């Protein structure tokens, strides 16, 4: 997924490059003026990748290879500070003993204005010790899985912002723990200009309230003062589609076409074992049915809420899992007059 955003002339870093397949595709996308660096700890993989680099360059019509393979660990990368436009990785950080150190290394090597798009395995609950020390599960990228909450918190603590879900698919369920393959993107923001073109941000929806990674709260239809750093972040995807940025405060209500909302059906709901995990780029969000979602934390939801979160406006921000399987044959529940069912 990370390769879809590669721009010509960029410098791309692949953590855990193996035989170099992703690096060679990145080499084609960045063109002869770009660079690609692959990091791996395995001598055999490095040897294979280096042998193929010259052949790939020739096939691409380049006068010399623009790919370099270096031996190193993910938590101590042989890469200079602030030199990378895009960091990619595929199910490698999961295997690192200290993932937070890897996140800090990623931030160190990223350019201001750089980004990452990485795929990895995460879980919905903390992996218990008997699985952590299961050597087979470790090799299957399960024992080292962080919860989605801890993974995204670690990225934020390292300095990245705008961390959000690009893709998700179920991986395995073991002893009631749900493991997911996720692709996440985030940014090391560049220095904001001293002068801002926007001074206010008004949340359009579909959420009724949001809290961003800096702790700023936005309420739908109500202008919130912002600074140049806020503007820089809110102009990045996927924030931009949710906000109206203006030089003067703009207030609007549900009669305004800029207001967006997805309301639950006015009907009874059923409980079928579904849980929703907010997957960024916000740390907290509220919908129009009194649910408050916190990033990465499972919240049990009923069938009506599942239908809401599976709509086009909501689905990019959530992982939805079912802990009950096919064991539920629940009866419909009538929602409370003054609030939601769940």
What is the meaning of each model-derived region?
Residues 11-76:
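Class I SAM-dependent methyltransferase SAM/SAH-binding core
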Residues 144-158:
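Short alpha-helix
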Residues 158, 164-169, 176-342:
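C-terminal lobe and adjacent flexible extensions of AdoMet/dcAdoMet transferase-like proteins
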Residues 85-98:
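A short SAM/SAH-binding and catalytic strip from SAM-dependent methyltransferases
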